[in-house]
Amino acid sequence: MPGTAATAIPEEVEVVASARSDDLLTLSAIAVFAFIITDVLCESGRAAVALLTISPAGRLSSIGWSSAYDNVWVDASGAAIGLIAALVFCILFRSFKTSGWSTRLFLLLCCAFAALSGAGYFVVAGFTDFGDWYTRLQGLHRWTALSVSLVIGGAMVYGLALFALSRGFGQLFTERQRVRRILLISWRAAILVYLCSAVLNPGGRGEIALSSLPIVTISDFGLFFVSLFLPRRASAAGEVAKLDRSFAWIGTSAVCALLFIFVLGRGLMLSR
């Protein structure tokens, strides 16, 4: 029995050490790059819908599309594009099984940010009337059929996204503590860059409050719950190696983050 206890402690220490061995800068870079990609896809897609339908001009920024000519379909397109993007990234993740695990982690984080933000729009907007669905719900009494449908439908999609993401992370990692650390670092790094870009938005506090920023920040917090749904495994034999420092990821992410904050954060005027 003493031998069993003695071997249990080193094994626990080994798991903790492994959970902390991934390079912090590289992991943050992958998360930031994934977040920027999904945000640009959603917001630029929304801008494209607006310009192709009703808006002759508007401002595209990191926290949303702003125009005096938008309608409910333009306001709704952000969430829809996010969910479509999540599905595409999920397919890519499942297809690139032989790629390096840092690449697969990038695709999985892209899927996570897009899915949680997209589904979160429905849930939060059904309760609060702000974000992309703010215009659609303006003037309606609380708990109409539309708002109830948004909350219920969004919650179902959100739960499905958490379940699917847990299966994805379960294919890469077997250590729960390692997954928690990866998700914590990813959320902090992504939201920090997002907030930095929002500070430079020329629309001021009012536009920021009604932008996608509050919903995205709250929705992506769901990353912390992914580890709760990880499949239980008896052995960690399939655990991937630690993430070493990659200046390719760090450099690419740094350039994109600077452009995201100082260019897209200030907004770009677009017209037909």
In which residue ranges do the predicted regions lie?
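Final/C-terminal transmembrane alpha-helix of multipass membrane proteins
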Residues: 32-33, 244-270
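Cytosolic, membrane-interface loops and tails of multi-pass inner-membrane proteins
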Residues: 55-63, 130-139, 168-178, 236-239
